[in-house]
């Protein structure tokens, strides 16, 4: 048995090397070569326009509504808060059954928010009830590990990622898991839906990113390169690439059609992990939230740092860019959210 395993291991290594060679042969240029004549973006200087105060403990997650005005945040204080980003008013403050929340999401329709964490359950809350109060409309149990990330496809479907090494697609009305996405060999930490909603990418503690077909439940591509856990992942606006942030202190850009890593964003002075990543609307800038309390802004094409958003007094745990591209929100363990532009 062990000799068979050894032979299979060697065969896999050989196949991996063949794939590496094939990828190298296909890589006829580099991002640096392609971007050599691109204008520099100049120093990106953003100011904090709003500070959202109200959480009493570390903020773990945030997500903008599709109206680019409201946002939802989740904190260790056991509250989910829906904010009006223009006025800084709290639209809803939702007490959670479990305060160990790690992720939250806003439905595209604006009618629902979802959250989950160490309770292994994705809870869906209806914001548009007749009585005007917010209530749990559905709980989705089924994962055997913590819920690390969730994103709505529509009001009746949500995709989740979990510490049980899997992702899942749920039918919210029936409360059933319709598809399980298995293949990662470490906790899945983050997911991002493609702009056309047909695929999603996931990043995990096996240091790999995977691309999944939502309809047939299959892993279509696997991307390696990181040297440690991938904490965050986000699609490029056109859907042909995605970026990741890792504990190895780098963000990386992967091209889906080229099937490989094409860019890396790092600096000798940055030695801490990345918690969150987001692209500007055009895709020219990549924002990363770091354990050292900063948010770095990278020029995607030239692979150089273009700015820093400094202002939090603790780890930046989450960030998001509005759909209209006009503002960035950062959330932190200092219990505050800041809106920049």
From Swiss-Prot:
SMART domains: WD40. Signal peptide: none annotated. Pfam families: WD40_Gbeta. Its main location: cytoplasm. It comes from the Eukaryota. GO terms for cellular component: cytoplasm. One of its GO terms (biological process) is signal transduction. WD repeats lie at residues 54-93, 96-135, 142-180, 183-222, 225-264, 269-308, 311-341. The keyword Repeat applies. Abundantly expressed in gills, gonad and mantle and at lower levels in digestion gland. Not detected in muscle. Keywords: Calmodulin-binding, Cytoplasm, Repeat, Transducer, WD repeat. GO terms for molecular function: calmodulin binding. It is found in: Cytoplasm. Belongs to the WD repeat G protein beta family. G proteins are composed of 3 units, alpha, beta and gamma. The G protein beta1-gamma2 dimer interacts with calmodulin. Guanine nucleotide-binding proteins (G proteins) are involved as a modulator or transducer in various transmembrane signaling systems. The beta and gamma chains are required for the GTPase activity, for replacement of GDP by GTP, and for G protein-effector interaction. This is Guanine nucleotide-binding protein subunit beta. It comes from Pinctada fucata (Akoya pearl oyster).
